[in-house]
Amino acid sequence: KSYIKKKYNKPGSVFLGVIHRLDRPTSGVVIFARTSKALTRINQQFKDRETQKKYWAIVDESFDSNSGTLTHWLKRNSNINKSYAHRLEIIDSKKGILHYKKIKNLNRYCVLEITLETGRHHQIRSQLSFVGYPIKGDLKYNAKRSNPDHSIDLHARSLTIFHPTTKVIMTIIAKPPIKPQWNFALSD
């Protein structure tokens, strides 16, 4: 808030609203609103599914297909902060849909680009684990081992929204963390 107050020469208190979140061990794009009106308008875009979120994930094993769609029913267990994917709808489950495209094959891993159609709790982590491809370092969702820094190799690569006042399409892109696994995964 102090940065915004100084940069925009704001008198009095400064508004800063969190529009969306990332799982704690995930890296990438997070956006904030500087006004309550912008917060309301962008939240409505998320509610109406007018936003587009792309993620990069390094997954255990070499993913079988080059692209596809995963559709599951996700049920959240708040007691252990985990969501479970199911093939069929069950009580209190929500439909989760994601699209994936293989970016690169590595020796024991591959890099996927994931586009979310729905935004459910731990959706990417749960669905990829359910089909046998947990995210590297994600012990909660069956990865073989943790990363040394306890992060997981899931990165919120980009977020596309409409500017809350001008309605211009904006795409915010975040570079992956400077870590050996990402450097190796994305090198040519």
Language-model region placement:
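RNA pseudouridine synthases
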Residues: K1-D188
